[in-house]
Amino acid sequence: MKKILLLSVFSLTLLVASAAISYRSIAKVERVSVETPVGCAPRLPYQVWVTYSDGKGEFRQVKWLNSSEATEKAESNPTINPVGTAYQVRGFIIGDNTTANGYPVTAEVQVVEGAWPVPNRIPVAEPLPLSQVSIDGNNRLTWNRDLDIDQLISLPVKQQLYNYRDTYGLSTEGYPESDGWDSPTTKLKGHGSGHYMSALALAFASCQDEGKKDILRKNIKMMVDELRQCQELTFVWDEKLGRYWEARDFAPEEELRQMQGTWSDFDRYKKDCRKYGYGYLNAIPAQHCVLIEMYRAYNNESWVWAPYYSVHKQLAGLIDIATNIDDKEVAEKALLIAKDMGLWVWNRLHYRTYVKSDGRQDERRARPGNRYEMWNMYIAGEVGGMAESLARLSELTGTAEEKAHLIEAANCFDSPAFFDPLAKNVDAIRTRHANQHIPMVTGALRSFRTNGNAYYYDLAQNFWTMIQGRYRYAMGGVGNGEMFRQPYSQITSMCTNVTSWGGRELHPEPTLNETCCAYNLAKLTKELNGFNPDDARYMDYYERVLSNQIIGSVNPNRYQTVYQYAVGLNASKPWGNETPQATCCGGTGVENHVKYQEAAYFVNDNTIWVALYMPTTAHWEQKGVTIRQECQWPAEQTTLRIAKGKGQFAMKLRVPYWATEGFTVKLNGKVVAKKCKPCSYVEIPVRRWKENDVVEVVMPFTKHLDFGPDKMETAPAYEKGGKTEYAPMWTGAFMYGPMVMATTGIRNWDEATIDVAPDLSDIVLMGASEGKGADAHLYTLTHHGHTFMPDYAGNDHVTHYFRMNIPADPNAQLPASNASSAIDKSQLRELLLIAKSRNEEQQAWNALMVKVPEYAPWATHGFSRMMEQAAKAQPLMDADEGRYSQEEIDKVAGALNAAINTMRPGNLPELEDMEELQQLLEKAKLLSDTNEKANRAISYAGMVIRYVSDGSGTMDMIQRATNQLKEVLK
């Protein structure tokens, strides 16, 4: 009877909605007024509180119109904007149809003397250690954790040691070759072993099964013992020098200039590990680390593949072991190995490298070892979190002199070309390799704990804020094909992404956000939260990326993770990565799922912050108190109980941004907080807590929309080079609390174009199912016949983003300050500035007599497309007012935006560069299935096509695949 009544009410709601639209419009927006230090672009909020005509309110995203590089450089120029200058920045609340570009807002900016406020270098709070917090119950969290641990202990530890023994001349008998990106013919080898060590350590801290902990402990000990055995082979006394042979002695400049990087060369290099230098520990000879000093390019066959990236993974693994295992001897040995390798890095970079940032690039590269150039190279200069690990080492170990060397080494990984603009709040993120740069920022922030230099804190804070406002998708991820695109262009980037399935036709490719980026953004967010634990924006984002992309990135049916995450239209998660060495995301993936609780609680001497709501038991050893949080996950209500101990402290509970209605806190049955401000913390002041004290939190999930900042107006067609034009429309995702909701059965953008009521009354929340394990507490909602489930639970052919037709209130009026009937060309102006800048870069390179670097700033085909669209757009920009309609202006702006966002750096191949390869592949597929050589060539060619489509392939890979196919087709 109850079910029939619910259906009747639902049917009646639909009938009423069809008869009359319940309009809701923005009635009020909080004022935006900021002070900015002279020489910096303003820090503008990425979200503002709006109040609607029905009295309700929420945070909405803002797109500010100062994001072009030229505009930001002007804002940060003290000659143009000296102290005392006041100016305005225009923007729009996205997803609103009051005007074509959204609801207009204005920020008042005042330029002042001084600097931004910077916290003390000692964080206000630290997360409770992983070993002191356990996840409880039978839910998706514990299911994923146990799946990960079981996979981890099934992996042969000797396989992880193969490359080390091979590199140091030890017998490899009984040690199976590694595979994936740690294979003997992959120069990133060692990265997977580093992730493996981190995962062992984190799993050890999280594991609830003593038998499994014993296996983890045994494997950790074997890794540490054998790595130290390898490292000790580099302890070589040199009588002539009167000291040990060190990193600075390895490869003198004359030798370095002649050093080659082919596989035959590396076979030679590994024959004498005594030359590597005291303390060198890596799965590949030391030549790999020093070739980057000659600015050798990313090329697995002939040169390098991110030398210091793999070093970082191994350092991080050793540090994680040292800080998580309960065996003191093993912990000390792991830390000693890491310290000795950290000092090798210091020795090499201190004595053999330098920084020169002025002059032309050929001048900057005239001598080996200019770190300005080294760390600014695509992938070859990818260093992971070297700075973070070295900074952590300086905190954990060493004499005063060694600590100073380690923090100096950490800051040797500063990238001035990237850091300097960020420190001024100028967006240096655009077009960079995403996962190359996120951990560099985390490292800078970690070094701030020791050096106290505001430069490092500022650049980290500015970077994080830019990500939130300009680059993130609804699930919390970033990037497309491993790259950051233009700011505020997520929808265009998503809708124009294409790939080849092995033939010559191009197809939409809805796999975008690299999982490594989610892992590293979560880590950066956790670090920032420690300095400002009362600012709920950090843990709001952490909850978003954890609840969606991270938890959704492991296959609950069998252990597999994803590289690029499924985002957009009719997207399927590309499962794979069954080992830490499979790819970079196989490595971060095996860590992700054994540490969900690492940021659940932050503490200091007198306060605990409850940052995440999940079923956990927290042992606050400093206070002698055990707190048990009892809830389902995802949680709309939770109970925190003092299970053991007593103590005096305050408790702060996060009010999520989405908790706009009904958030209530009770202490021992008495209401202590209600009508709380979203995106804040509620404090229960310092009191004497005792066993069985109970805090109850009610936080009903609300329905809301998460819009992309740009409208959807074009998508690739299935014929090569074709595209389909659409009327510009805001595109967004349905949200249920922190969860992105997705549905199946949507095949194209026409089907993904939907009507949505302004007050969201046609979105019906259905609550949660029962279930256990991976399917426990599964929420759903419905909208016009489609049932939506959380993104983390969807696998195949799911759609997250929809073109949403939300009627604007015809009676709504803008405030007088924002009312305007003029044609808005602001976005077209910003795009033309980008096109102008890129054209100038390309022409400057063309004019060089000696091409340094050897490739142009922008790849040929994409550059030509941009110039063609810019030529079409410029006349509309120059035309008198009224000659062109807003629709015509927006159309050319959209086409130019699409052209800009599909450009690639000049060192990367484009899809057009695979024409011959794809033709050969089609022919090769006609050969007999029993031709093993052909099958290997076909498999490799398919992999290359995927890599190039994703943006991570290289011309040498295309050439190698082409040659292999030609050989089998003879």
Predicted segments with their positions:
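Positively charged n-region of N-terminal signal peptides that target proteins for export
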Residues: 1-4
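Bacterial N-terminal signal peptides
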Residues: 7-14
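Beta-rich interaction/scaffold domains
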Residues: 20-114, 817-970
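Aromatic (Trp/Tyr) and acidic
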Residues: 118-208, 248-272, 286-326, 370-373, ...
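Extended, well-ordered alpha-helical scaffold segments
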Residues: 136-137, 144, 211-230, 327-348, ...
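Hydrophobic, small-residue-rich alpha-helical packing segments that form membrane-like cores
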Residues: 336-439, 446-450
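C-terminal beta-rich recognition modules with glycine/proline-rich loops and embedded aromatic residues
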Residues: 460, 539-548, 553-641, 677, ...
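Solvent-exposed beta-strand/loop surfaces of large extracellular or lumenal domains
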Residues: 660-685, 705-713
